[in-house]
Amino acid sequence: TNSLPYMLHMLNELGCYAEVVSYTEYALALQVGFEKSHIVYNGPAKDKETFLDAIKNGAYVNIDTKREIEWLNDLNKQHSYKVGIRVNLNLGKISPEDAKEGESDSRFGFSFENGELEEAINKIQLCKNVKLGGLHLHRTSLTRSLNVYRNICKYAIRIINSLGLELDY
């Protein structure tokens, strides 16, 4: 995410996507010229109106909270939509050498280990016009080494295989 208009404009000109975590950042990305379909919308502080607008217009929206799953029911049933979901991950278990000492689960997303992720995915799948398109896994690490990203990818593959998911991203 970046809230510097000149930087966003340059990134848009280069064909990059904007990653936003709030209404303000979403509006700024649109103001500098990003197409809605070139926005990735993450974070637990989404407002309902912007959340629905982003989904309706093809943005990559990653669901972070249970209330966002409920909001999917307000989408027009005559159209199909795609969303992603944020996985709550414990970096200390996945990549201990890259985690801060004593680090536990993230406070964002849905935990695979306790069944919360599968339950959330099942609720999304009850919305017949909404397809789960991807997983979002993010966690700040001490090292930002290739190893941490490799371990997160392995974890994502484990989830995909375990839950039998067919995803686009």
Identify the role of each PLM range.
Residues 1-166:
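Active-site-proximal beta-alpha core segment in soluble small-molecule metabolic enzymes
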Residues 169:
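Catalytic palm active-site di-aspartate
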